[in-house]
Amino acid sequence: MSYIWLIKKKKLKKHTKVYMDFFDYGEQDFVMCEMCQQDRAVDIHHLESRAMGGSKNKDYIENLMGLCRDCHNKAEADSMFNMFCKIKHLENVCHQIYAMIEYNKTMKRYENRK
């Protein structure tokens, strides 16, 4: 279990840090569940389970999704729901990448005006 909001004394787990850094969240930010967008995301779900074998490093952004407890339990139990989670998460990742590209373009235009 990876809590997104943490007591200051606790160290972020690697996969939580990867997720938080990519989406530019701070430790105190309210992070909504990527699926239901109703509850606070308290878990970072590995879309491809670490227990499924293959690469031992499953802590890359395409494989990490912020979910509330209910959605996380459902994703763990229901392979079809987990597939929908993968699709939704990849949409969110693509949107974030697009936003970063647009931000960089805007900053370059601003810098060129100087």
Model-based region annotation:
Residues A41-V42, C68:
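A composition/secondary-structure signal for short, hydrophobic, low-basic-content segments
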Residues V42-I44, A77:
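Short, non-ligating residues that shape and space the ligands of small metal-coordination modules
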Residues M1-A41, M52, F81-K114:
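A boundary/linker detector
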Residues I44-H45, C71:
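Single, functionally critical "micro-switch" positions that shape active/binding sites
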Residues K17, L47-E48, K74:
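Compositionally biased, intrinsically disordered low-complexity segments enriched
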Residues E48-M65:
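Short linker/helix segments within small regulatory modules
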Residues I61-C85:
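Short Cys/His-centered divalent metal-binding micro-motifs
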